[in-house]
Amino acid sequence: MSQLPVILKAESIHKSYRMGATRVNVLKGVDLAVHEGEFVAIVGASGSGKSTFLHILGGLDRPDKGAIQFHGRDLNRVGARELNRFRNKRVGFVFQFYHLLDELSVLENVLLPAMVSRSIVGWLAGRGAARKRAEGLLDQLGLRERTGHKPYQLSGGERQRVAIGRALMNQPELLLADEPTGNLDSATGNGILNVFETLNKAGQTIVMVTHDERIARRAQRTVMLADGRAR
């Protein structure tokens, strides 16, 4: 794996938050390099800064100090508009609580990133191809018969698979998953991990946060966060 190029690199990441009169240092110089096609699990206890670090990796938050490089480019030096494009087109996010829109169908939820990334004219011109891709993703995820359903009509595992389809809609180079099985029973969570393994075998780069070391072992490499540092 080390012979493949590094697509994401974190260098000496620091992050703190203020709680009343106290400043809490969450990350104290975290380093990480993720190679193309790698499946990395970041594991640590509750409050160790795992989710904070993942959000910084994906451009959802900025560090107090340190650099996040994507293909060698420092995201801290990127403006807000370009950072939005980066998050929409090059990174896919999967969260513990799905964040699906109940008023939209399963298919429409998966289509959302494609709709957001295009102008009205561009969307009208390309919606047929986008719909075909969304339907293909749902088919691969075992949801062919659910495309017209609303999220509230689905099981937890089905909703998480919809969220994965949405994350993959724009063919991101990097998939970031924050406790993707944390809201699921063990059998359903295992099914989601099987999906991640299949995606990774097809070349998808994945960074997953979990508090469960058993889940982390499904990844190719595990990074432990403790006392604000990576081990």
At which residue positions do the language-model features occur?
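Conserved switch/coupling elements of ABC/ABC-like ATPase nucleotide-binding domains
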Residues: D227-R231
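ABC family nucleotide-binding domain
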Residues: P5-L225
